[in-house]
Regions:
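Structural motif
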Residues: 33-37, 76-80, 126-128, 148, ...
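N-terminal glycine-rich phosphate-binding loop for ADP-containing cofactors
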Residues: 6-16, 20-29, 61, 65, ...
Length: 714
């Protein structure tokens, strides 16, 4: 019977090994620095990663250098990476193949044992962070005695919590004991949960993650010279952020308490990795290195064996791979060049569109409205946003001037005559949009792409009055436009390949992820959300308390409850969305009279002066409450799960998107569906809903961990 180490080693048969290349560098003050360069032999498209074979080789290399240090042959050891990369962390393709908790624990132990050799080398050790340092890549640096960073390094981070695991090669213990608890909370928890935010080199220096920063022109030479100063005793390294007795006695616990409350309100209790990471950071206050590392071993073993890490990896692959090769997209060489953009409307949404198009495409953008005052206000709003970007250092002054000059406004549609792309941002009413496009078509060329931002109307019907409906496409953004990464690109029956290709290429130029959908009610995101919100409102209107609804939906792990989501999108908008879906599918979607009453009332939740919810508004509860038999939270949860499984199954059967993966990609990018749920379909498989209503799962094999237990389907 093979041991856990044997099984871990077996995973390395096809690993892209990052090798450890050693060369001796004479130090200016005398002596030798052994420089280890990590390099996987691939180009910049494949960052160096740390799989089992890589760790074994690095460990053997460091053992050899320790022996040389003991013999007086080297006076310092440093590790750096190939151009642009230190290391991008663990080889996630290998981690996701781990077959058991024991093997996961062995991987954590191997990481600790290997990287820990930098702490036990017998001479000063350095890591020269010459580029990207993520996860295990940063943990290499944390194990060393000293760290330098290249000011051009792309990113520095511990993103593990974002992926459903924790820093488990020393990061959760070493970092708080190096930079203090507040900085560690930012790097380990806050940044990953803010859509995987990373540190710039200057930020890492300010936090104390690294000791000194050098420019890229002579980074290696400067780092070696600095290391020589440290070894020779000329350079003193200050560590002002290392926690002292007062921080450990008072500040540490207070910061953990604040973080715990923040997690409860922003993340909830479903996602495991943030809470496990918080426990590790809390324990790092009093534990020694060995105890802290052992706790990391157990934490990684638990999380890798569970479902959430595997769901996270599924979602990660969707965003990193599938989103870059959209299903159903025509060849990119069919796309027309977009050299000028017209935006119909001058309100807030139109301004967001114009700002995005001018900033990303760097082409003239014209907004239009029937009222000159609204046009002027819209242009000023856009230009003001551009100037703010310059003030924040996001763009240069020269670029700001160029962008401002590219934005103009008009009340005359004839100014769209030479536009290659026209998008509308007008009221969500069929007749209004039909009239807009009929008027636009009269002045633009036959090849101009017409794009509608409709969220619920039929694109085909919007184009009913067009002479050339083949150049109309749905281009549905999500709010806020600058932040949300998804665009649903809607192919109506008449939309031709050149138009669709132009839409997909334009979305990519806007730095958005585009998913091709058929012209069906709600497309993907709104149809799924309409099902969820409709079931929530139906439950309340038939006797179930709203508190029960929130308990029922909590296991979905969504960033907000159904009622919070309704307030966010707007109660009137929510009522319209439910009405639209009920009209299309009256037997499956609830038309909520209670929601219309709430829209007139204006709110669902009772909030304090800072906008924090205190509970349900009593009048709102009365307005939406109805008679009937109250469901328990478990009963309602099962009803919603089965309803979602049924609706998504119908969407796939009807060809709204190509595959379940596209549904999940839309929900992750457009609705904030948690990575650790993997979107909707892996969750619906895990709880048995897909088998109950469809007789088969969405995924075969299921997206689950090695310790997954099949639910009962009774």
């Amino acid at each position: 019977m093979s041991t856990a180490l044997d099984q871990l080693t077996a995973l390395s048969h096809d690993e892209v090994v990052t090798h450890s290349f050693v060369r001796d560098v004479p130090l200016p003050s005398g002596g030798v620095l052994a420089l280890v360069t990590l390099d996987n032999g691939r180009d910049h498209k494949r960052p160096s990663t740390l799989g089992p074979a890589t760790l074994v080789e690095l460990g053997e290399t460091l053992d050899g250098l320790r022996g040389r240090a003991a013999r007086g042959e080297v006076q310092a050891i440093a590790v750096t990476g190939k151009p642009y990369f230190l290391a991008a962390g663990a080889d996630l393709s290998k981690v996701s193949q781990i077959p058991s908790r024991d093997v996961a624990r062995e991987l954590a132990r191997l990481g600790h044992a290997t990287l820990g050799k930098l702490h036990e080398a017998g001479v000063p050790t350095f890591v020269f962070v010459n580029g990207l340092a993520l996860g295990g890549g940063l943990e290499i640096a944390l194990h060393a005695d000293y760290r330098t960073v290249d000011s051009s390094a792309a990113a520095i981070a511990l993103p593990e919590v974002f992926l459903g695991i924790v820093p488990a090669w020393g990061g959760a213990w070493l970092l708080p004991n190096l930079i203090g608890i507040e900085g560690a909370l930012r790097v380990v928890l806050e940044n990953p949960l803010k859509n995987n935010r990373t540190l710039k080199p200057a930020q890492a220096l300010e936090l104390g993650v690294v000791d000194v920063q050098f420019g890229p022109a002579a980074f290696l030479e400067d780092s070696i010279r600095w290391a020589d100063g440290v070894v020779a005793g000329r350079t003193t390294v200050s560590r002002p952020h290392v926690p002292g007795k007062l921080e450990r006695a008072v500040k540490w616990g207070a910061a953990i308490s604040i973080a715990r409350k923040s997690l409860e309100s922003k993340v909830g209790t479903v996602a495991r990795s943030p809470w496990v990471a918080l426990d590790l950071l809390e324990a790092a206050r009093t534990t020694d290195r060995a105890t802290g590392f052992a706790a990391e071993d157990e934490a990684l073993a638990e999380l890798v064996a569970g479902d959430q890490f595997h769901a996270s990896m599924y979602a990660f692959d969707l965003v990193q791979k599938r989103a870059k090769r959209p299903a159903g997209a025509p060849p990119a060489d069919l796309a027309r060049t977009v050299g000028k953009v017209g935006v119909v409307g001058a309100g807030l949404m139109a301004s967001q569109f114009a700002l995005l198009f001018v900033r990303r495409l760097q082409v003239p953008v014209v907004i239009t409205d029937v009222d000159q005052a609204r046009v002027d206000a819209g242009v000023e709003r856009i230009r003001g946003e551009i100037l703010q970007l310059a003030e924040k250092g996001r763009i240069s002054g020269d670029e700001s001037n160029r962008l401002v000059a590219l934005v103009t406004g008009t009340t005359d549609l004839a100014d769209f005559a030479d536009a290659d792309w026209v998008i509308e941002a007008v009221f969500e009413e069929l007749g209004v949009k039909q009239e807009v496009f009929a008027n636009v078509e009269a002045v633009v060329s036959e090849t101009t792409v017409l794009a509608t931002n409709t969220s619920s109307l039929s694109v085909e019907q919007i184009g009913a009055r067009l002479a050339h409906p083949e150049r109309l496409v749905g281009f549905h953004f999500f709010n806020p436009v600058a932040v949300m990464p998804l665009i649903e690109v809607v192919k109506a029956p008449a939309t031709d390949d050149a138009t669709l290709s132009t839409a997909m290429v334009t979305a990519a130029a806007l730095r958005k992820n585009a998913v091709v959908t058929a012209d069906a009610p709600g497309f993907v995101v709104n149809r799924v959300l309409a099902k969820l919100l409709g079931e929530a409102m139906h439950a309340v209107e038939t006797g179930t308390p709203p508190e029960t609804v929130e308990r029922a939906t909590a296991p979905f792990g969504l960033p907000m409850t159904p009622f919070e989501l309704l307030e966010l999108v707007g109660l009137t908008v929510g009522a319209h969305v439910l009405d639209t879906h009920h009209a299309a599918f009256p037997e499956r979607f609830h038309a909520s009279e209670g929601l219309h009453r709430l829209a007139e009332h204006g709110r669902v939740l009772d909030r304090d002066a800072k906008g924090r919810r205190k509970g349900f508004d009593k009048r709102a509860v009365a307005l939406m409450a109805g008679e009937g038999t109250a469901l328990s939270a478990d009963e309602l949860r099962r009803r919603i799960e089965d309803g979602l499984a049924d609706e998504i199954g119908r969407m796939l059967d009807d060809g709204v998107v190509s595959a379940a993966e596209d549904v999940d990609l839309c929900l992750v990018l457009g609705a904030g569906w948690p990575f650790q749920m993997g979107g909707a379909t892996p969750y619906l498989d895990r709880v048995g809903a897909s088998r109950r209503v469809r007789g088969r799962p969405f995924h075969d094999p299921l997206v689950v961990g090695p310790e997954h237990e099949e639910p009962t389907t009774a």
